[in-house]
Amino acid sequence: MAISKNLPLLKNHFRKHWQERVKVHFNQAGKKASRRDARVAKAAKIAPRPLDLLRPVVRAPTVKYNRKVRAGRGFTFGEVKAAGLTPAYARTIGIAVDHRRQNKNQEMFELNVQRLKEYQSKIIVFPRNGKVPETEQVLSTAAAFPIAQPAVETETRAVQDNGESAYRTLRMARSEKRYKGIREKRAREKAEAEAEKKK
C-alpha cells in the first residue's frame, strides 16, 4: 500500500535504514532560485528566440468550464496545413503541434488558423548558420499573442412563471423511463384480457 496523506502508517515494519530514505523538501527555496537562473540562462542561450512555443486557443472540457477558452497543447495538422505550413517546419519556428487533438468545430479551427497567420506575419526567421542581427528578444510568445476570453452577449428577459416545477418534470421523466417496460406490459396484458372477454 502506498503512503499518502498525513495519516499514521499501517503495519510500519521498516527496515533498510529507512531514516536515510525519508524524502524532505528543505531545498524548496533553492530549487526556485535554480529554476529562475535556468530560465535566464536559457533565454540568453536561445536569444532572440522566445522561451515558449505558440499554443492554440482551445475550449476547456466539461460542462462546468466549457464557457472559457485557454491555451491548448498544440495545433492540429489540419490547422497547420490551412495556414500553409507543414508540421515538421512549424515545430522549427516555435509552433507547438499536437498529433492527437481533433478539430470538432469550424469556429475554433478558423480562429487558430488566423492565430497562426498572425504569428507568421510577425515572426522573423534567421538563417541557421548565418549571422544573427541585433534584435529585441521577445521572452514570452504567450504574452505577445495573448488568449482573450470572448465577450458573452446576453439580454435581460422577463421572468415567466408558467406554474411548472423543474423538480416535478425531472421526477416524472425519471419515473417514465424507469417504469416504461412494466407499464407497457400491463397495458398489453389488459388489452389481451379484454380481447379474451370479447371472445
Swiss-Prot record:
Gene3D superfamilies: 1.20.5.110. It holds the Pfam family Ribosomal_L13e. One of its GO terms (cellular component) is cytosolic large ribosomal subunit. Coiled coil: none annotated. Keywords: Ribonucleoprotein, Ribosomal protein. It comes from the Eukaryota. GO terms for biological process: translation. InterPro entries: Ribosomal_eL13, Ribosomal_eL13_CS. Residues 178-199 are annotated as: Disordered. The keyword Ribonucleoprotein applies. HAMAP family: Ribosomal_eL13. Belongs to the eukaryotic ribosomal protein eL13 family. This is Large ribosomal subunit protein eL13. It comes from Maudiozyma exigua (Yeast). The lineage of its organism: Eukaryota, Fungi, Dikarya, Ascomycota, Saccharomycotina. The gene is RPL13.
